[in-house]
């Protein structure tokens, strides 16, 4: 199992002006994944983190080549389960009342087999418990951030995946 932990460049300065930096991060991730797969065709790889782009941005769809439908993913390709969550209106971060999914966990197609004698991907989610949500004011419903005047957690909701296998 190989884990790539990421924090891609910020959108500070404007989404379009900074897009090339995140696209470069996506290309580097793809290059690392390709290298690992050359060493082991059946490598199980997970790339995850705060990517500062959503599942439909060029850094994810083109540079990394992630696909949102399990059935369209070959073993050497990358599956992004968070694309489906965004299409359902869910998100990890909100800006001007628009949700996006900047925090993602993506897996190579080697995690998508129906052979549960080895670890396989089952499902993904966004962790949104009440204690993580702003309950009042301008940002009601947003992640409860930490500030000088309030105790909170983060401006992003956490994400998770379930990896399962058959018991012995």
Q: Residue locations for each model-derived region?
A:
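Metal-dependent phosphoester-hydrolase catalytic domains
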Residues: 37-43, 53-168
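A shared catalytic/ligand-binding motif for oxyanion handling
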Residues: 6, 20-23, 42
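Active-site metal-binding loops of divalent metal-dependent hydrolases
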Residues: 8, 50-51
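Beta-strand-turn-beta hairpins that frame and shape the catalytic cleft
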Residues: 1-12, 165-168
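His/acidic metal-ligating clusters that form di-metal
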Residues: 25-48
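Second-shell loop/turn segments in exported
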Residues: 12-22, 47-48, 90-95, 147-148
């Amino acid at each position: 199992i190989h884990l790539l932990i990421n924090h891609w460049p910020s959108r500070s300065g404007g989404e379009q002006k900074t897009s090339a930096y995140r696209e470069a991060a996506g290309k580097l991730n793809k290059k690392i994944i390709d290298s690992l797969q050359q060493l082991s065709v059946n490598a199980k790889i997970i790339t995850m983190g705060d990517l500062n782009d959503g599942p439909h941005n060029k850094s994810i769809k083109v540079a990394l080549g992630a696909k949102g439908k399990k059935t369209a993913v070959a073993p050497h390709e990358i599956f992004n389960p968070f694309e489906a969550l965004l299409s359902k209106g869910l998100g990890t971060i909100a800006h001007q009342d628009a949700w996006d999914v900047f925090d993602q966990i993506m897996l190579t197609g080697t995690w998508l087999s129906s052979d549960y004698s080895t670890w396989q991907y089952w499902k993904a989610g966004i962790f949104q418990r009440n204690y993580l949500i702003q309950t009042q004011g301008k940002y009601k419903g947003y992640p409860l951030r930490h500030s000088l005047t309030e105790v909170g957690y983060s401006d992003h909701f956490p994400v998770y995946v379930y990896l399962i296998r058959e018991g012995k």
